[in-house]
Amino acid sequence: MSDDLSLAKEWAVCRPNDQNGWVHAFKVTDPNLSVLDFQELGVLAWMAELMKHRDAGKSRRFNMLSQKFIAKFGVDSSGCDIIRGWRANASYFYIVTEFVHDEIDVDILEELLMLGGLGIQYCIKSPRAFAALSKVSGYPRPVAYGEYNNRYNERDRQARDRMDELISGPANKAVRVMSTLVEGDA
């Protein structure tokens, strides 16, 4: 979920099937839900959360280091109602894969996650949170495939180009990488 209507429309038609999509809008009616905000916890906690739930090729290296990384930087998200963090679609999981292979310095991780302006996503996690959702009047609304799929693809292309530039550029020192963070005192 996103609070950015334009991004939600792009995500509604990001599939390559030439079909129009739908965007829905909800509001949360329970102000007492627990929200785990990874922007407050930091990029390393977010990376650990992604590693818990996404496949980075399941290489031997990933299997060896990810559990240590999760133990060191992860947080217990099991008791929260809503998770707030950087958008983590499949194209951006490339960042995690490169991080696992020590190709990305931690100093550029947050900048990489912000490329493409994908913003923040919300994960409604608990039954209590789902029960607290109410539909906003006037939704769902149709989303034109041609317009918003083109926007999605252009945003993705620009972000991938910028990722490649940043990863291969001078800002990426590749010194404070996953293996050094796991083994060191970072």
Task: Label each residue range with its predicted role.
Residues 1-15:
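Extended catalytic/binding region for NAD+/ADP-ribose chemistry, centered on the ART fold
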Residues 14-25, 29-186:
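Conserved NAD+-utilizing ADP-ribose enzyme module
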